[in-house]
């Protein structure tokens, strides 16, 4: 099986040295993402205008293709088949054999790309093959403007490349071509989308989480960060830094005037994140702030928040409205996480200012004990995001993991609804119930607690984290199902 990986167009307009560097980084990223397949026949070769991937194991094709569509820097992926040919008529015969069933009752056009010296042009092949297909498939009709099927062919020297399928890529720049950033992640719609946008633009995104809601909140945000990394950024190692911000919030509640609390809290977060960024050599912070969305996100307040630190703050969503942000979250798969993620920042100020005055803010901050901020930063927990899955195993070691089910057990499929539809879970003589992970906290108590519930997800990370959460809530009738 062979894939031709086409580069994001902005890469192709770079200078020769930059373009070669980007292609080299993208090739390395692809290798890193696919190394878990342990396929000895996998070969990846970079060229000037594309990257070629081959494997002898056809069963891995769908998994490889799915992974490639989630790697930044790729415009599209062509699933192709190499063949030899003798002349233009032979090209037509092979194309007819490959596309006859596909074109029945459809409109079509033929598009050809050619490399090398030949006695014919690309247009010659398009007309000859297209005319032949039109004659030999009676129900097929040519439509050059809006065809239902596009027959893509490539003639490379003495090889005919039949394009069996085209898959759209993520676009953007390969991760690692730009410098590292630190995302202030809360688990909501905005921070998840802003993190994704910087990954897509070529940045390795580390995560900084300010914990205001205890272990349950931290577990939820870890799920979001791990999901984003695993889905779009697993080519690189990244950090997840958790800072216990409850002492800072307590000091603000005690020392700062009500109306100024929101801006002061954001300034404290920026100060703390800047210290973390400096410690690890990160160049910029990323937030999910959008202009005018909440009281602290007016231009006046954002300017005051920026002034708390010299570190560059990037706000990729600054001009986006909430509906658009939610749509983006739905596209990348973080919507379900964000729907049930509690928002703690908004509860600390009853009448927040929308136009803070610098002198007033500084006066309020003069009452603040900054040793508390320094202490929570020094005590921050820093983990490799790849260890989150391992940590979840260690944290729920008291939660039994089983591979077989008893007749009286109830299997809870906690995957998102779209995942359940794509890969339905059916087991003989076992009751299977659907309860997505984001509804567990609110609906698990409604279940019959005399039964034992086995939580299932594809990779086992989400089920372990949710099992830990339920155990913390006092439920002992929970296990993890790993077939």
UniProtKB/Swiss-Prot annotation:
ATP binds at residues 184-185, 266, 288, 297. The active site is at 457 (cysteine persulfide intermediate). This is tRNA sulfurtransferase. Pfam families: Rhodanese, ThiI, ThiI_fer, THUMP. Belongs to the ThiI family. The gene is thiI. Residues 405-483 form the Rhodanese domain. GO terms for molecular function: ATP binding; CCA tRNA nucleotidyltransferase activity; tRNA binding; tRNA-uracil-4 sulfurtransferase activity. Its EC number is 2.8.1.4. Disulfide bonds join 345-457. Keywords: ATP-binding, Cytoplasm, Disulfide bond, Nucleotide-binding, Redox-active center, RNA-binding, Thiamine biosynthesis, Transferase, tRNA-binding. Residues 62-166 form the THUMP domain. It catalyses: [ThiI sulfur-carrier protein]-S-sulfanyl-L-cysteine + a uridine in tRNA + 2 reduced [2Fe-2S]-[ferredoxin] + ATP + H(+) = [ThiI sulfur-carrier protein]-L-cysteine + a 4-thiouridine in tRNA + 2 oxidized [2Fe-2S]-[ferredoxin] + AMP + diphosphate; [ThiS sulfur-carrier protein]-C-terminal Gly-Gly-AMP + S-sulfanyl-L-cysteinyl-[cysteine desulfurase] + AH2 = [ThiS sulfur-carrier protein]-C-terminal-Gly-aminoethanethioate + L-cysteinyl-[cysteine desulfurase] + A + AMP + 2 H(+). It is an enzyme of class 2 (transferase). Pathway: Cofactor biosynthesis; thiamine diphosphate biosynthesis. It is found in: Cytoplasm. One of its GO terms (biological process) is tRNA 4-thiouridine biosynthesis. It comes from Yersinia pestis. One of its GO terms (cellular component) is cytosol. Catalyzes the ATP-dependent transfer of a sulfur to tRNA to produce 4-thiouridine in position 8 of tRNAs, which functions as a near-UV photosensor. Also catalyzes the transfer of sulfur to the sulfur carrier protein ThiS, forming ThiS-thiocarboxylate. This is a step in the synthesis of thiazole, in the thiamine biosynthesis pathway. The sulfur is donated as persulfide by IscS.
């Amino acid at each position: 099986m062979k894939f031709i990986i086409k580069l994001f167009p902005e890469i192709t307009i770079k200078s020769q040295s930059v373009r070669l560097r980007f292609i080299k980084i993208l090739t390395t990223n692809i290798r890193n993402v696919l190394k878990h397949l342990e396929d000895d026949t996998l070969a990846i070769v970079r060229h000037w205008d594309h990257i070629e991937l081959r494997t002898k194991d056809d069963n891995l094709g769908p998994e490889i293709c799915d992974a490639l569509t989630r790697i930044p820097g790729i415009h599209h992926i062509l699933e192709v088949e190499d063949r030899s040919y003798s002349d233009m008529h032979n090209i037509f015969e092979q194309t007819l054999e490959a596309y006859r069933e596909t074109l029945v009752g459809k409109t079509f056009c033929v598009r050809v790309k050619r490399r090398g010296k030949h006695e014919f042009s690309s247009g010659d092949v398009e007309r000859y093959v297209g005319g032949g297909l039109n004659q030999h498939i009676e129900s097929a009709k040519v439509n050059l403007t809006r065809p239902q099927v596009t027959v893509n062919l490539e003639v490379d020297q003495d090889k005919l490349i039949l394009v069996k399928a085209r898959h759209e890529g993520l676009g953007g720049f390969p991760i690692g071509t730009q410098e590292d950033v630190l995302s202030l992640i809360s688990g909501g719609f905005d921070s998840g989308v802003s993190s994704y946008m910087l990954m897509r633009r070529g940045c390795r995104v580390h995560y900084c989480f300010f914990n205001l809601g205890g272990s349950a909140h931290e577990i939820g945000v870890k799920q979001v960060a791990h999901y984003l990394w695993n889905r779009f950024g697993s080519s690189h190692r990244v950090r997840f830094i958790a800072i216990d911000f409850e002492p800072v919030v307590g000091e603000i509640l005690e020392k700062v005037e009500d109306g100024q609390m929101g801006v002061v809290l954001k300034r404290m977060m920026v100060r703390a994140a800047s210290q973390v960024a400096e410690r690890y050599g990160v160049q910029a912070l990323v937030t999910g702030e959008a202009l005018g969305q909440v009281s602290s996100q007016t231009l006046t307040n954002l300017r005051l928040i920026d002034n708390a630190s010299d570190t560059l703050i990037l706000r990729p969503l600054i001009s986006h409205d909430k509906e658009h942000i939610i749509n983006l979250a739905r596209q990348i798969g973080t919507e379900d996480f964000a729907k049930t993620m509690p928002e703690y920042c908004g509860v600390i100020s009853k009448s927040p200012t929308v136009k803070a005055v610098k002198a007033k803010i500084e006066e309020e901050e003069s009452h603040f004990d900054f040793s508390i901020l320094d202490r929570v930063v020094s005590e921050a927990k820093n983990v490799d995001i790849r260890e989150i899955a391992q940590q979840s195993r260690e944290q729920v070691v008291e939660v039994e993991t089983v591979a077989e089910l008893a007749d009286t057990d109830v299997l809870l499929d906690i995957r998102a609804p779209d995942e359940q539809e794509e890969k339905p879970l059916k087991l003989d003589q076992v009751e299977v119930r659907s309860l997505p992970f984001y509804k567990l906290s609110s609906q698990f108590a409604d279940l019959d607690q005399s039964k034992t519930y086995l939580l299932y997800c594809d990779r086992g990370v989400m089920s372990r984290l949710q099992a830990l959460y339920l155990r913390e809530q006092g439920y002992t009738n929970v296990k993890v199902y790993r077939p």
